[in-house]
């Protein structure tokens, strides 16, 4: 029942309050964010994470070489890599692995411009098979077929950005 003695008669209101509109917009934004994140290919995440894992393992081999008188490195194959000590397979365990090797997820491959292995000397510098310092940047490429991630190792210093 509408009271007529009010200066502005109260009428039935149709519509939404500003609070309701804001809540709906926030909920839709949150749902859209999850849909966009989940819609990205899994191999994109795998490629990024495998790139960081490989960098960590390269740094580990470099650290071991700097803590030892022998060279340390990683031997590369199309679907993974393994730890090397004095250019032969090592039995030491890679960080966060259960053994001296790491297998890449299916669909991701690895190639290196320097060949099938990356070695570091006691100064942490990348060296070739004959222990000569490398004069060019060493590049290791991880690929999932549509995207690539390149890891570069700086000559002489062994810096891995």
Regions found by a protein language model. Name each.
Residues 2-8, 16-19, 25, 30-59, ...:
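N-terminal helix-rich module
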Residues 13:
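Glycine-rich phosphate-binding loop
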